[in-house]
Structures are given as structure tokens and as C-alpha cells.
Amino acid sequence: MKLLVVEDDHLLNNTLCYNLSAAGYTVDAAVTKKAAVSFCEAQDYDLIVLDVNLPDGNGFDLCEKIKERRPDTAVIFLTANDME
């Protein structure tokens, strides 16, 4: 299973990639919307773990763009935002 982690917090990105790789998944990592788009244009992913807030854009907009090209790709959103 091929995964893409899109998270601008380097510690969280590295932790997710390490644990997912240790669980046997093939994992790529991006820290910006632009990098994620490049990865998605180059290959297919079974699952994308996507931060809601990225330094160069919005995770929801990125999800829409990904789903236009590959509607079957599963997406899990992450955020450090609270409800307050």
C-alpha cells in the first residue's frame, strides 16, 4: 500500500512516516501543497494523510484537486486546530 503524508510540522511528519513505514507501508512525505501536487501527479496513492493547514495553501483545496484526478484515493485529515 502506497501512502503520502502531507504535514508541515517536521516532527509530526517524520513520526508518521516512521511509524507507517515500520508497519510495512511505502510512504512518501511532503511539507507543502506544491510538493504534494507534484507527488500526486507522478504516482498513485492508496491513502493520503493530509494536514488541513499548510504553509502554501489549504488542505481542503488540495483534497479537491487530488480527487478530481484520482477520485478513489482515500484521504485522512489531520489538524492541530482546536474547536475554540
Protein language model annotation of sequence segments:
Residues 1-84:
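N-terminal/domain-start alpha-helical segments
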